[in-house]
Every structure is written in structure tokens, then in C-alpha cells.
């Protein structure tokens, strides 16, 4: 699972989901990529699930890059606990994704298989995504 090795502060305020991605919105490493179309918190489990979906479909011969990292903790108080008495423990780690951000990149010799693998990975993510190619970006 993707989690930070150590953090300066265990609990943070929730990040805002407004605005568009300022950087990381072009395919740079691979030939194809998954681009977010709406804001979302993507957990470390969802990232891992999408990565496994890509690897299971293409098996061998390709390369996958994960361009997001879950570096923000989300806290939650236990069920049935009254308000007050401090902030709850860290429940999960999320990546704050804004529209336009490239989430995964991939290179694979067979284009049809690569696009199908990215489509399957996109179904595991909590936001609308689209598949982009490097040659389409100028």
C-alpha cells in the first residue's frame, strides 16, 4: 500500500477540491494516460486496485507509472462517539486530485490492449476519467 513513511503532523485539515490541476496534466513518461475530469479524493486502496487491473490485463511487456501519491490523511471518529474530545484517528490516506491531472501513464506495444487496460483501471477510480495519448497533446 502507498502511505508516507513519516509525516511532520499526523492529522491535517481536509484539502480543498476546487480549482484545476496546475501541473502534471500532460503525458510525459509513457504513451497513454488516464486523466481525471472531476475533483476527487483517491485512496491508497483505489490506486492499488487500478494498478492491479492494468497489470492483470497486459501481463508482460509494458510499463506503468503512477503519477499520484496518497499523502493526505483523512481522520474519522468511531461510530457512536459524541462530538468533542479531539480529532479522530487517521482512517485512510488520500491523494487530492483536481481536474486535468494525469493519474496513471503506460507504455505498451499493442495500442488496443493498452487502451483496454486503462479503461479497466478507470472503472476502479471514484471520479470520471478519460484516456489520453501522448501524440494528441501538442
Swiss-Prot record:
Keywords: Ribonucleoprotein, Ribosomal protein, RNA-binding, rRNA-binding, tRNA-binding
Disordered as annotated region, ranges: 1-23
Biased amino acid composition, Basic residues: 1-16
Subunit structure: Part of the 50S ribosomal subunit.
Keyword field contains Cell wall biogenesis/degradation: no
Protein name listed in UniProt: Large ribosomal subunit protein uL16
Molecular function GO labels: rRNA binding; structural constituent of ribosome; tRNA binding
Cited function: Binds 23S rRNA and is also seen to make contacts with the A and possibly P site tRNAs.
Provenance organism: Corynebacterium efficiens (strain DSM 44549 / YS-314 / AJ 12310 / JCM 11189 / NBRC 100395)
Gene3D superfamilies attached to this UniProt entry: Ribosomal protein L10e/L16
GO cellular component, one term: cytosolic large ribosomal subunit
PANTHER family: 50S/60S RIBOSOMAL PROTEIN L16, LARGE RIBOSOMAL SUBUNIT PROTEIN UL16M
Gene that encodes the chain: rplP
Stated family: Belongs to the universal ribosomal protein uL16 family.
Cysteines paired by S-S bonds: none
Cleaved signal peptide residues: none
InterPro entries for the chain: Ribosomal_uL16, Ribosomal_uL16_bact-type, Ribosomal_uL16_CS, Ribosomal_uL16_dom, Ribosomal_uL16_sf
PROSITE patterns named in the record: RIBOSOMAL_L16_1, RIBOSOMAL_L16_2
GO biological process, one term: translation
